[in-house]
């Protein structure tokens, strides 16, 4: 659906979790067992955590993490540069536990399905396109899509029969039929078309009403789309480059919003992590269950 107009239900007040600035914050994930928010700073090569009592801390340095999932045992599965997958537990990272056959590529956004598989995108390079893969629980990869222009936000409908997949540079969110039994996708269609908008769609989150919340890179905002792809709400953010979002807290009723710094550092609140109460609740966390 082409987004020519905007119907706003409400403008939500914003807050910041701290004054800490990231270079390129991505992939926020709420860890229920730890009552903490994790995210990655891709450019700074760091994995970070926020706890309401302790503030922000860097839990790991020297890791280029495009995205990650929370395993059912509470550890983190890290999707990294060079097409490799690592494992984080108790402050320690084990790198290269799994890898793609292709080289010179970096994983970007990822999401777990309800059966423990992981859908994961890889970035295009000068000599190769981006791809979308599925990582099965036995540690094997299957390529689902090729020639992808900057794969980004991934999410599922409430009944898990629809997969949402964002191509940022094409400014489109696609929808596919998803087969839970096999993990295969089919019948791609355009869910939302942002080519006449000022922003580019980035990370996404889905609420319990089936609405899709999309971070808007370059447009100082997060938009909410109903199940037909129509924009029904918007949250304004005091940072131009909004990268991703997730629901968190015990009731999944708080939205956490990551951003990146502009080319000129310390402009507005760029690079900070924001929080809002959107009046919606997020779907329960889906854990990965990859044998590592």
Predicted regions located by residue number:
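Hydrophobic/aromatic beta-strand positions that recur at structurally equivalent sites within the blades
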Residues: 40, 50, 87-89, 135, ...
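Short, solvent-exposed loop/turn segments at conserved positions within beta-propeller repeat blades
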Residues: 42-43, 125-129, 168-169, 217-218, ...
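Short loop/turn segments immediately following beta-strands, especially the blade-tip
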Residues: 176-183, 278-282
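Blade-level signature of beta-propeller repeat domains, shared across WD40, Kelch, NHL, RCC1
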Residues: 250-292
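Flexible "stalk/tail and boundary" regions
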Residues: 52, 72-73, 89-91, 133-139, ...
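A short loop-to-beta-strand structural motif that recurs across blades of beta-propeller domains
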Residues: 46-48, 84, 131-133, 172-174, ...
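A short beta-strand motif characteristic of beta-propeller blades
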Residues: 14-18, 55-60, 94-100, 140-146, ...
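Beta-rich, blade/repeat-based domains predominating
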Residues: 19-34, 62-80, 101-118, 124-126, ...
């Amino acid at each position: 659906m082409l987004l020519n107009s905007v119907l706003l239900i409400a403008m939500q007040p914003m807050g910041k979790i701290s004054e800490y600035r990231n270079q390129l914050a991505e992939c926020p994930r709420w860890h229920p067992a730890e009552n903490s928010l994790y995210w990655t700073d891709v450019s700074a090569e760091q994995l970070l955590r926020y706890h309401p009592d302790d503030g922000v801390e860097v839990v790991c340095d020297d890791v280029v993490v495009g995205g990650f999932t929370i395993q059912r045992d509470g550890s983190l599965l890290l999707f990294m540069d060079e097409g490799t997958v690592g494992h984080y537990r108790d402050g320690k990272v084990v790198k290269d536990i799994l890898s793609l056959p292709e080289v010179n590529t970096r994983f970007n956004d990822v999401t777990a399905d309800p059966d423990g598989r992981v859908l994961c995108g890889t970035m295009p390079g000068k000599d190769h396109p981006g791809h979308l893969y599925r990582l099965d629980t036995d540690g094997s990869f299957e390529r689902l899509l090729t020639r992808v222009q900057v794969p980004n936000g991934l999410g599922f409908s409430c009944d898990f029969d629809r997969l949402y997949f964002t191509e940022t540079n094409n400014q489109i969110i696609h929808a596919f039929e998803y087969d839970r039994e096999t993990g295969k996708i089919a019948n791609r269609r355009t869910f939302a078309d942002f080519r006449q908008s000022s922003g580019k769609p980035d990370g996404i989150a889905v609420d319990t009403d089936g609405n899709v919340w999309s971070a808007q890179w370059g447009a100082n905002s997060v938009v909410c789309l109903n199940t037909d792809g129509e924009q029904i709400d918007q949250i304004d953010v005091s940072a131009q480059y909004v990268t991703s979002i997730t629901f968190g807290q015990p009731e999944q009723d708080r939205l956490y919003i990551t951003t990146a710094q502009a080319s000129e550092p310390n402009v507005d609140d760029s690079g900070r992590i924001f929080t809002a109460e959107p009046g919606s609740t997020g779907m329960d966390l889906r854990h990965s269950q990859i044998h590592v």
